[in-house]
């Protein structure tokens, strides 16, 4: 009887341990997967400022190009592609958080007009799904379905990102009209230089916080440096901490100025933004245009036939 109770207790503890382990794994993976979009989502209600600047530029300081391609016009309740291209040299390597070199990742934010949103999976064609790859898009906010974010994803595979977009129908959404609308996009390649709290990452240049003489350079066991500067004004010691990644540019005994670079700038990535325009086209207007073109063509045909008939009558009268 005691053995049976012991077995039940062991079984219960193992079950509890496995359940807790699974929960920790899921939470950890979720936080890692969502780390990039959360940087902007937690800090800003809207990723596009009143000036037109996209807030990702606050952390990704280098300016790089980005391109967007959308149809000139779409019909209501239609799925279409918005293609975002984030070009960069695939041979480049970036500094990772641990100071080692690795491949660049990319990310993008697509700001659509109100009413436009990510297409549901059952509306996406197999051809479009093949172009999309294994990307997981998400809305910037549950209440802002027109703003879509993606990343970080491997740049080697996804420097061109296909967004599946569903256009709104003014018949069901009264605040949507048949007009020309702007679309804004921001895209980055590589890690940022500043974290949302204002602290520097190891993917940027580090400058001297005091003028003076470099009295000591200590290489840390896990990488990086502690640089001790004897202040030129009063001789007190200032210690600058350099994380693993950037290459050191100064040496012991060297005189340096305030804000002089102590390291190289390891950043090889950057952020860019662009825009495009799209027309939400009224089907009745399209039908009217087609009817007008058809009537013009028919009128031309009848005019040609009438002219030939008139020429035949003239020829007959001349012969008579």
UniProtKB/Swiss-Prot annotation:
It is found in: Plastid, Chloroplast thylakoid membrane. The keyword Disulfide bond does not apply. The chain crosses the membrane at residues 286-306. Heme binds at residues 36, 56, 59-60. GO terms for biological process: photosynthesis. The gene is petA. Component of the cytochrome b6-f complex, which mediates electron transfer between photosystem II (PSII) and photosystem I (PSI), cyclic electron flow around PSI, and state transitions. HAMAP family: Cytb6_f_cytF (MF_00610). SUPFAM superfamilies: Cytochrome f subunit of the cytochrome b6f complex, transmembrane anchor, Cytochrome f, large domain, Rudiment single hybrid motif. Binds 1 heme group covalently. One of its GO terms (cellular component) is chloroplast thylakoid membrane. InterPro entries: Cyt-f_TM, Cyt_f, Cyt_f_lg_dom, Cyt_f_lg_dom_sf, Rudment_hybrid_motif. This is Cytochrome f. It holds the Pfam family Apocytochr_F_N. One of its GO terms (molecular function) is electron transfer activity. The 4 large subunits of the cytochrome b6-f complex are cytochrome b6, subunit IV (17 kDa polypeptide, petD), cytochrome f and the Rieske protein, while the 4 small subunits are PetG, PetL, PetM and PetN. The complex functions as a dimer. Keywords: Chloroplast, Electron transport, Heme, Iron, Membrane, Metal-binding, Photosynthesis, Plastid, Signal, Thylakoid, Transmembrane, Transmembrane helix, Transport. Belongs to the cytochrome f family.
């Amino acid at each position: 009887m005691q053995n049976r109770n012991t077995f039940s207790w062991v079984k219960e503890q193992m079950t509890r341990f496995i359940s807790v382990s699974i929960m920790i794994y899921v939470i950890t993976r979720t936080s890692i997967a969502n780390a990039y979009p959360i940087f902007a989502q937690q800090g800003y209600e809207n990723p596009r400022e009143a000036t037109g600047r996209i807030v990702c530029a606050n952390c990704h300081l280098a300016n790089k190009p980005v391109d967007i391609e959308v149809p000139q016009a779409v019909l209501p309740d239609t799925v279409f592609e918005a293609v975002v291209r984030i070009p960069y040299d695939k041979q480049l390597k970036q500094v990772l958080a641990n100071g080692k070199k690795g491949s660049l990742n990319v990310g993008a934010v697509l700001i659509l007009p109100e009413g436009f949103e990510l297409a549901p999976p059952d509306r996406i064609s197999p051809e479009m799904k093949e172009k999309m790859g294994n990307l997981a898009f998400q809305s910037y906010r549950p209440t802002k379905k027109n703003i879509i974010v993606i990343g970080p994803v491997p740049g080697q595979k996804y420097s061109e990102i296909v967004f599946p977009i569903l256009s709104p129908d003014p018949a069901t959404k009264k605040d949507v009209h048949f007009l020309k609308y702007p679309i804004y996009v921001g895209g980055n390649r590589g890690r940022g230089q500043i974290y949302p709290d204002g602290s520097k990452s190891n993917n940027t240049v580090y400058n001297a916080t005091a003028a003076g003489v470099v009295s000591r350079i200590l290489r840390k066991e896990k990488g990086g440096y502690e640089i001790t500067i004897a202040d030129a004004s009063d001789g007190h010691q200032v210690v600058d901490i350099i994380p693993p990644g950037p290459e050191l540019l100064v040496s012991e005994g060297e005189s340096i100025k305030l804000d002089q670079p102590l390291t190289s700038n390891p950043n090889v990535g950057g952020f860019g933004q662009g825009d495009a325009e799209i027309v939400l086209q009224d089907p009745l207007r399209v039908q009217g245009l087609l009817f007008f073109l058809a009537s013009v063509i028919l009128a031309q045909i009848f005019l040609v036939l009438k002219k030939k008939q008139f020429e035949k009558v003239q020829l007959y009268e001349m012969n008579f």
